[in-house]
């Protein structure tokens, strides 16, 4: 599997493509511009997504939103991407409010390799940040229901920001306790234009110390997905307010609900083909304003791609 990722890197093919199958969401996250229903949303079929996936050939196909579990045909979409789409790895990105043990098992059977479950605090504060009362306990209950699974296909996804960066070690320890993995993604102000959640420069030494501790946990337990390269870029983003040389459109991009393409989830577009997206967007792309996990991991130099993927896929 790692070989396909390296091959995509060398052939300038996307490492990750996020199929945003709906913009509708049942959460009201403080850091996000989405939320609520989307009346009369135009949505592609499972077959249309699979056809695109087969043509694009990403290393990772994410099924995301919005909240993807709001789609009643989500299992059909996953199965289509895994079979007709020939996706090497399928990840469902979810807040988990609608994720039951039964649905988890059905999606696993359909071909889902991993669930990226949002978790930003190691306690009930997560509910307020995501706008869903009882969400932390819901996630805790799901993990307990899956205790008999030989390997829980769950990776927590934490958005690192001003109000929670001191809690990152506690989140990593919780992931160890619950026998799951955890990833850390940098807060981006591009979604809401709110700079208030940026970790202030005067606290970056604290963040450096915390990420050093997380790397120790990673070496010992192999349950932290984010690597030293990603943490260094995270600190650089908070220090400078941006990261140059964005590779959106090449290393990663978005499939919209209607199967048109966007450079990323923060820059909307309706390109019909990858060729059209690259030709129009990439020459004029000067954006520096995010360092989300998909960007940080897709833009690693080749040596870090190899080293980090071998480490992550062995876990």
Question: Predicted regions span which residues?
Answer:
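Conserved alpha-helical substructure of the radical SAM core
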Residues: 1-114
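Flexible mid-to-C-terminal extensions adjoining Fe-S/redox cofactors in radical SAM and related proteins
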Residues: 13, 240-246, 258-315
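Short, intrinsically disordered, charge-biased short linear motifs at domain edges
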Residues: 14-19, 229-235, 253, 269-281
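Cys/His-rich metal-chelating microdomains
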Residues: 24, 28, 35, 249, ...
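Flexible loop residues that form catalytic
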Residues: 37, 66, 120, 187, ...
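Alpha-helix N-cap/loop-to-helix initiation residues
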Residues: 70-71, 100, 161-165, 270-271
């Amino acid at each position: 599997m790692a070989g396909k990722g390296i091959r995509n890197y060398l052939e300038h093919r996307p490492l990750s493509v996020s199929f945003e199958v709906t913009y509708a969401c049942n959460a009201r996250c403080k850091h996000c511009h989405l939320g609520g229903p989307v009346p009369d949303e135009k949505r592609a079929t499972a077959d249309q997504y699979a056809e695109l996936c087969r043509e694009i050939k990403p290393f990772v196909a994410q099924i995301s939103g919005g909240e993807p579990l709001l789609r009643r045909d989500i299992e059909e979409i996953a199965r289509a991407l895994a079979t007709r789409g020939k996706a090497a790895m399928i990840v469902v990105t979810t807040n988990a409010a609608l994720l039951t043990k039964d649905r988890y098992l059905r999606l696993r059977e359909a071909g889902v390799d991993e669930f990226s479950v949002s978790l930003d605090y190691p306690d009930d504060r997560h509910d307020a940040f995501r706008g869903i009362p009882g969400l932390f306990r819901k996630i805790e209950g799901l993990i307990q229901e899956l205790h008999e699974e030989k390997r829980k296909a769950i990776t927590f996804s934490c958005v690192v920001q001003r109000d929670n960066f001191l809690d990152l070690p506690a989140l990593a320890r919780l992931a160890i306790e619950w026998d799951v993995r955890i990833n850390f993604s940098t807060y981006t102000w591009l979604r809401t234009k709110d700079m208030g959640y940026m970790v202030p420069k005067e606290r970056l030494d604290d963040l450096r110390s915390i990420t050093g501790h997380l790397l120790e946990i990673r070496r010992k337990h192999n349950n932290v997905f984010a690597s030293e390269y990603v943490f260094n870029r995270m600190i650089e983003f908070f220090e400078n307010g941006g990261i140059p040389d964005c590779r959106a459109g090449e290393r990663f991009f978005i499939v919209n609900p209607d199967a048109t393409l966007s450079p990323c989830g923060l820059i909307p577009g309706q390109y019909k083909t990858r060729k059209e997206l690259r030709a129009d967007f990439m020459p004029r792309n000067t954006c520096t304003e995010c360092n989300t996990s998909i960007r940080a991991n897709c833009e690693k130099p080749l040596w870090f791609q190899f080293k980090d993927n071998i480490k992550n896929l062995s876990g």
